Amino acid sequence: MNMQVNGQAMIGRRGFLTWGGQLAAAGAISAFAPARAWAQAVDLYPTIRTQFESYVSSGKLPGLLATIGRAAGMPDVVAIGTQGLGETTPVNIDTLWRVYSMTKPVTGIAAMILVDEGKMKLDQPIADFLPEFANMTVLTDPDNSMDAVPAKTQITLRHLLTHTAGLGYSIITKGPLLQAYLDNGITPGIVSRFPIPGQTASAPTPDIKTFSERLAKLPLVAEPGTKWIYSISLDLLGRVIEVASGMDFEAFLKARIFEPLKMTSSYFQVPQSEIKRFVSNYAPVNGVLFPIDPASTSIYLNKPAFAFGGAGMVTSARDYDRFLNMLANHGELDGVRVMSTATAKLAMSDLLPSAVTTDGTFAEGAGFGAGGRVGKGMNAGVFGWGGAAGTVAFVDPRTKLRAVCMAQYMPSNVYPFQQDFAKWVLKDIGFPA
């Protein structure tokens, strides 16, 4: 039987991306990988190369890949290792990886395309599209009770984009609301076909419409617009996009982002024909890598209940680099404009409600834009996010610097990989760490 494991199973609560004001970037591909319009650049990034080699040679990870771009065109690539333990296929720019929450910025940008076209507004109540959210309630004691009072504020698009809607997340939420989420299939994400000891399995709702309807019947953790709480808001946003656009969410992504940007290796279900370039996912346990989702039998080979806008994508470094390159150029790539310059800049700006900060959270010290973190201070203008299986990506439109780093292990906080990666990149490109 296929087991769809609740995201809490292998995802560290603070392991999605501990950016801490640091940038993250890198790339990995083996010198033996077939040439497909890219070139190995390990000599340009000695720190990244050394660290990647250390992770792989010590058996901590089978393969790592990163891309770093500082101008238009193809990025530099650094790659070490293979697609899985005991395998000989080297990782390369077209290898497929589970990027989990790095799906969120893609969904956020999809919503901003509709804002650009006037089909949605940032501060428009989502109840205009999903009437079931017109009369929400808010828990009075979220960790201990389901007692709730009527919400004073309507959930808006801005709230969904910035995790300030007051929604929960099965990987973070506690108490009786967590059980209600599990009972109702409010678990938009998949990890493994197999049960994981000590973790609760819960199948997602059968479709995104049911997901929205069931979620609307459950209380919020906080009043909308008052607190930053990492949540399922980007998954719900997929349903808002469907109604606002009149298109299936996944079809909208393909038509408005993937196809225009020539992102030909981005999926929510990995085709059988592409298994040969799909990596396996591992859980490090007492120094040993345990395969929780082998590529050959991956749960991602099955059609998901729906396209999870918060954690469902499988993609290549080449594809995600093209997404970032479009953002670096404020909405345009290779002569194809995805959104206006003004809207692209808006999407990567701090969209948090005026009274909300990320203080006291794992995103502390940053703002939040359309599904991704926004740097402040010396990192002002940097936009990006990470994934639960060790991936991370960012773009700085001011300098045109962009980077994607791919790894595949859970929980991501087992190793300091995502945090350290920033230091390696900064050192290799000549910036003080």
Predicted regions and their residues:
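N-terminal secretory signal peptides
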Residues: 1-12, 22-25, 30
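Boundary at the C-terminal end of the N-terminal hydrophobic targeting segment
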Residues: 37-41
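Short, conserved catalytic-motif segment at the N-terminal edge
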Residues: 42-99, 119-121, 135-144, 378-380, ...
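Active-site SXXK
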Residues: 52, 72, 98-126, 234-242, ...
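Short, surface-exposed loop or secondary-structure junction motifs
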Residues: 77, 137-380
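Acidic helix-start/capping segments at beta-turn-to-alpha-helix junctions
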Residues: 127-135
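Structured C-terminal helix/loop/strand segments within mature extracytoplasmic catalytic/sensor domains
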Residues: 385-433
